């Protein structure tokens, strides 16, 4: 048993291997009451049987908190508006799910009068930082227990053996022991053969949300998305709330094998890791939103927003959601979205998302100016004066070089 004594500990619980064995481990080593807290951010089928499992494993109580609506409206949609992709590919599915869960953990810890909050994140991963930054933001004095940084278990194989020895029910084996994270936005897969970059992912065995390209339909499907101020509000002409819209897009996108990426990323803690991510609905929303922005944003705003998007992605990935900078960037992004309203038609086919036409009352595209045909608005002779002025720095530089030579 560890030296420090806690009376009541709040555990961020998922029902997976890590948090399942942590319940008996906490009781054995700290002699404490364990209250499990599940943040429902759209895990769907993973929630089935969690209450019974947590109690059977030794928890005195379990909270299953429905955070799905808040997750979509306050975390997912603002990140889509930002156009944030970590290292140009990752749509941040795990990253922005952690702050909302951590915030609720602190609230329940206060409600229950708990001494500490415990999470099951490894000492090599990003999630430990994301959870603990958020916890410290809302309660700097809260004690945090991170078993992976203290216990003698060093691998998932040893975790499985611990579960067997302590009669903890699990539904995985040594052979299917991928580390997964699922929510309404995405499903990630890490570990096993994926730890070796030379290995091609076994998509037919890994994928759960998406079809492989071979199994995707041979016929394309067209959909129409409506946006209001950068937020998707309708699908095929039907107004939908954010949760329902994303659920529908996940089904449609998954059917067509959309949103699967195999990525080697730079973790916050310094190492590289490899993962396969399934984000079918999210990938459709990102493509639609980005294309609509191209129609509605002016050049200077669009180009500067690219810089903001990169920083926004880093902040989210690093667990810095609850920071003044993230809030300031969100304020800028919100301003840019005032005219991102309209409809976009998309063609979905075997992993591809193809723009099939879009309209907006705020469109900055003018056929009168852009046409290659005859027009009476744009005087092409004006281009000569513009080029003379625009090229002036280059001309001066060239003349200086000639003098030196």
From Swiss-Prot:
Pathway annotation: Amino-acid biosynthesis; L-arginine biosynthesis; L-arginine from L-ornithine and carbamoyl phosphate: step 2/3
NCBIfam families, sorted: argG (TIGR00032), PRK00509.1 (NF001770)
Subunit structure: Homotetramer.
Gene Ontology biological-process entries: argininosuccinate metabolic process; L-arginine biosynthetic process; urea cycle
Residues the record lists as binding L-citrulline: 90, 95, 126, 130, 179, 188, 265, 277
EC number: 6.3.4.5
Entry GO terms, CC: cytoplasm
Keyword line: Amino-acid biosynthesis, Arginine biosynthesis, ATP-binding, Cytoplasm, Ligase, Nucleotide-binding
Organism: Clostridium perfringens (strain 13 / Type A)
Residues at which ATP binds: 12-20, 120
Family matches, as SUPFAM superfamilies: Adenine nucleotide alpha hydrolases-like, Argininosuccinate synthetase, C-terminal domain
Reaction catalysed by this enzyme: L-citrulline + L-aspartate + ATP = 2-(N(omega)-L-arginino)succinate + AMP + diphosphate + H(+)
Pfam families per UniProt: Arginosuc_syn_C, Arginosuc_synth
Compartment(s): Cytoplasm
Entry protein name: Argininosuccinate synthase
Binding site residues for L-aspartate: 122, 126-127
Keyword Protease recorded: no
Membrane-spanning segments: none
Family under the similarity heading: Belongs to the argininosuccinate synthase family. Type 1 subfamily.
GO molecular function: argininosuccinate synthase activity; ATP binding
């Amino acid at each position: 048993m560890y030296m420090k004594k806690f009376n009541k500990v709040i555990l961020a619980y998922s029902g997976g291997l890590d948090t399942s064995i942590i319940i008996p481990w906490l009781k054995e080593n700290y002699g404490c009451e364990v209250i499990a807290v599940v943040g429902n951010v759209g895990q769907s089928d993973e929630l089935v049987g969690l209450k019974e499992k947590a109690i059977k494993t030794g928890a005195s109580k379990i909270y299953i908190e429905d955070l799905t609506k808040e997750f979509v409206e306050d975390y997912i949609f603002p990140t889509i508006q930002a156009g944030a992709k970590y290292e140009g590919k990752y749509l941040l599915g795990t990253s922005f799910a952690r702050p909302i869960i951590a915030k609720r953990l602190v609230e329940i810890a206060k409600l229950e009068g708990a001494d500490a909050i415990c999470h099951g994140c490894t000492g090599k991963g990003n999630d430990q930082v994301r959870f603990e930054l958020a916890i410290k933001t809302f309660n700097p004095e809260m004690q945090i227990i991170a078993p992976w940084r203290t216990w003698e278990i060093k691998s998932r194989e040893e975790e499985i053996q611990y579960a067997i020895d302590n009669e903890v029910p699990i539904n995985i084996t040594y052979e299917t022991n991928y580390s997964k994270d699922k929510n309404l936005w995405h499903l990630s897969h890490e570990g096993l053969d994926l730890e070796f970059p030379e290995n091609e992912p076994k998509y037919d065995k890994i994928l759960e949300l998406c079809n492989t390209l071979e199994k995707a339909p041979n016929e394309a499907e067209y959909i129409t998305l409506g946006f209001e101020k950068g937020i998707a509000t309708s699908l095929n002409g039907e107004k939908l709330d954010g949760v329902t819209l994303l659920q529908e897009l996940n089904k449609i996108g998954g059917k067509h094998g959309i949103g699967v990426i195999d990525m080697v990323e730079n973790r916050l803690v310094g190492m590289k890791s490899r993962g396969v991510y399934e984000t079918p609905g999210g990938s459709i929303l990102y493509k639609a939103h980005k294309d609509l922005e191209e129609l509605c944003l002016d050049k200077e705003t669009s180009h500067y927003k690219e810089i903001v998007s990169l920083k926004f992605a880093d902040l989210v990935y690093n667990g810095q959601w609850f920071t003044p900078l993230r809030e300031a960037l969100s304020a800028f992004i919100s301003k840019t979205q005032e005219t991102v309203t309209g409809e976009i038609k998309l063609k979905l086919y075997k992993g591809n998302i193809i723009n099939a036409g879009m309209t907006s009352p705020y469109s900055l595209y003018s056929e009168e100016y852009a046409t290659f045909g005859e027009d009476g608005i744009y005087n092409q002779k004006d281009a000569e004066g513009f080029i003379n002025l625009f090229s002036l720095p280059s001309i001066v530089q060239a003349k200086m070089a000639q003098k030196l030579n």
